[in-house]
């Protein structure tokens, strides 16, 4: 309880700083995590490259693509409407959500959320009156989050109009507590490798992580294991739709120096998750320094420095 209150107290001045001086905010947060300042003039690794891109390049296109509702139009424009998870609706007010018309099970998401505490699986058959009251309060809180990018200097979120979306709930694989999330790192339109999240906890934060190449070779040596980000005891099975995932990622990432294309595999099909431009705010601590440098080099070769 005290930790939550402290976070709330600290968040306000930090949010103000993030809105008015995002470079200072980023430097301070990076220093707190890595005990050194980032090289923003000549980035050397993927973290520093992401920080550079979000602070010093045109990110106006990111806003539509970071919006979980608006990005659906982009996916359709790229000829991939068939990989969109069926949508039940999108609403700007909680009172407008027709819960009685929705199926027994579905998932709710904040269109401007990062998935950590801003999505909720709903099973109407298990909901009490108190549960419905709590759910509506939670959704109202999501809609009140209008400056979520300020704390990390992420400009793409400031222009998103908050909404609640409801989607079909995809079935999970046997032995998994959540859908396996296949995240493809793409640099200048070319897929590079997979970051795979499995057995994600309900809090949205704790998850098993794995690094795989495009041939599904497993590379635990590229990861830093922690209590929050453990590794699976064994490599995950090769996805049935591996080649299709790579094709989809290539199509969706075309034209961007760096983006992570997040996909699911369910019922023998590829499904779109989201596009992520600022993974962990550009402060990833689950990759080794060497692997971060290797990935960063794929991006920086073709960038024009402006700092």
Predicted regions and their residues:
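Membrane-proximal basic amphipathic "stem/tether" segments
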Residues: 1-57
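C-terminal active-site "lid" helix and adjoining low-complexity regulatory extension at the edge
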Residues: 23, 247, 265-307
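Active-site nucleotide/adenylate-binding loops and adjacent lid/helix of ATP-dependent enzymes
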Residues: 56-58, 63-180, 188
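Beta-strand scaffold of nucleotide-dependent catalytic cores
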Residues: 107-109, 181-197, 206-211, 271-276
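Short, surface-exposed beta-strand-loop junctions and turns on beta-sheet-rich folds
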Residues: 114, 200-202, 278-280
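A short, polar/proline- and glycine-enriched secondary-structure boundary/capping micro-motif
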Residues: 119, 203-212, 282-286
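Glycine-rich, pocket-lining loop/helix-strand segments that form or immediately flank
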Residues: 123-145, 205-231
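A long amphipathic alpha-helix within ATP-dependent nucleotide-binding catalytic cores
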Residues: 154-168, 208-270
């Amino acid at each position: 309880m005290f930790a939550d209150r402290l976070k709330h107290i600290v968040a306000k001045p930090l949010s103000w700083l993030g809105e008015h001086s995002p470079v200072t905010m980023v430097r301070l947060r990076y220093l707190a995590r890595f005990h050194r300042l980032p090289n923003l003039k000549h980035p050397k690794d993927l973290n520093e490259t992401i920080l550079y891109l979000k602070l010093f390049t045109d990110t106006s296109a990111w806003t539509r693509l970071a919006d979980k509702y608006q990005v659906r139009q982009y996916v359709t424009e790229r000829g991939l409407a068939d990989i969109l998870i069926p949508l039940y609706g999108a609403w700007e007010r909680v009172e407008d959500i027709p819960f009685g018309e929705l199926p027994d099970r579905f998932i709710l998401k904040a269109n401007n959320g990062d998935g950590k505490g801003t999505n909720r699986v709903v099973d109407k058959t298990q909901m009490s009156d108190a549960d419905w009251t709590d759910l509506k309060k939670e959704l109202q809180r999501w809609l009140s989050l209008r400056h979520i990018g300020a704390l990390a200097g992420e400009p793409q979120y400031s222009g998103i109009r908050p909404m609640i979306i409801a989607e079909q709930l995809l079935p999970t694989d046997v032995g998994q507590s959540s859908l396996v999330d296949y995240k493809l790192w793409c640099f200048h339109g070319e897929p590079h490798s997979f970051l795979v999240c499995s057995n994600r906890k309900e809090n949205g934060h704790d998850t098993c992580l794995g690094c795989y190449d495009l041939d599904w070779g497993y590379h635990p040596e590229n990861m830093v294991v922690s209590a929050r980000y453990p590794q699976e005891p064994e490599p995950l099975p090769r996805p049935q739709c591996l080649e299709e995932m790579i094709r989809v990622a290539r199509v969706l990432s075309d034209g961007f120096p760096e983006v992570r294309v997040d996909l699911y595999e369910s019922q023998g099909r590829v499904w779109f998750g989201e596009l992520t431009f600022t993974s962990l705010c550009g402060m990833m601590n689950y990759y080794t320094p060497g692997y971060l440098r290797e990935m960063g080099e794929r991006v920086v070769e073709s960038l024009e420095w402006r700092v």
